[in-house]
Regions:
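Catalytic beta-strand/loop cores that center a nucleophilic Ser/Cys/Thr
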Residues: 60-186
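A glycine-rich, often tryptophan-bearing local segment used as a flexible ligand/cofactor-contacting loop or short
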Residues: 11-86, 158, 162-163
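Short loop/helix-cap segments at secondary-structure boundaries that form the rim of catalytic
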Residues: 1-2, 40-45, 98
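Glycine-centered flexibility motif
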Residues: 7-8, 29, 90, 130
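Generic beta-strand/beta-sheet core signal
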Residues: 7-8, 34, 135
Length: 186
């Protein structure tokens, strides 16, 4: 896309702004939204696609499964082979898919589905000449939870395992970090 609009969990947005956002996407823009933007932006701008299921989450971490590893939204970000985790902030909005023909689930979580009734963690759908990407929780804020031995391993060891070479200065900086800390994006 030539232009991307990021809306990270807003409060109320005016009806005029909703129309401008919808027109932006229809003209070929990409809308990237998180969490409460589901109810406040996506539902009014793109009805019948996805919605909040009215069961807000607790503050916890769930295992996720990458469904579309080749999606440009996920390229180089998540490696589905390594038991990735996702932080659900308290009061995050689970995503209910209403139009399964148009909406593609990129990431899902069985744990999220068992606890809150919806498995979708990140979705994308086309609208006009553009598209909308939405994810539960926030893109900038994650937390560490060491759930298994992989998360406790040294970050430099993981980088080496994945074929990422690091110079000695970077390796020294990474020496005290475990993989869980790196994945948490703190």
């Amino acid at each position: 896309p030539e232009q991307v609009l990021v809306v990270n969990c807003p409060g109320n947005v005016s009806p005029a702004a909703i129309v401008r956002i919808r027109d932006f996407v229809a003209a070929g823009g990409t809308l990237f939204t998180t969490d409460w933007a589901l109810r406040n932006i996506v539902e009014p701008a793109f009805p019948g696609t996805i919605e909040y299921n009215d069961r807000s989450t607790g503050d916890e971490v769930v295992r996720i499964e990458v469904v579309e590893a080749d999606s440009p939204y996920l390229a180089g970000v998540l490696d589905g082979e390594n038991d990735p985790q996702w932080w659900l902030e308290g009061s995050s909005y689970p995503i209910r898919v209403l139009d399964a023909e148009q909406v593609r689930v990129l990431i899902r979580s069985r744990e999220l589905g068992e606890r809150y009734g919806e498995e979708a963690v990140a979705v994308v759908f086309p609208y006009g000449k553009g598209e909308v990407f939405h994810m539960i929780s926030h893109y900038y804020l994650q937390r560490t939870e060491l759930r298994n031995a992989r998360h406790e391993q040294a970050a430099v060891s993981y980088a080496s395992e994945k074929g990422v070479s690091v110079d000695s200065e970077t390796a020294e900086m990474m020496a005290d970090l475990n993989l869980g800390d790196v994945e948490s994006a703190e």
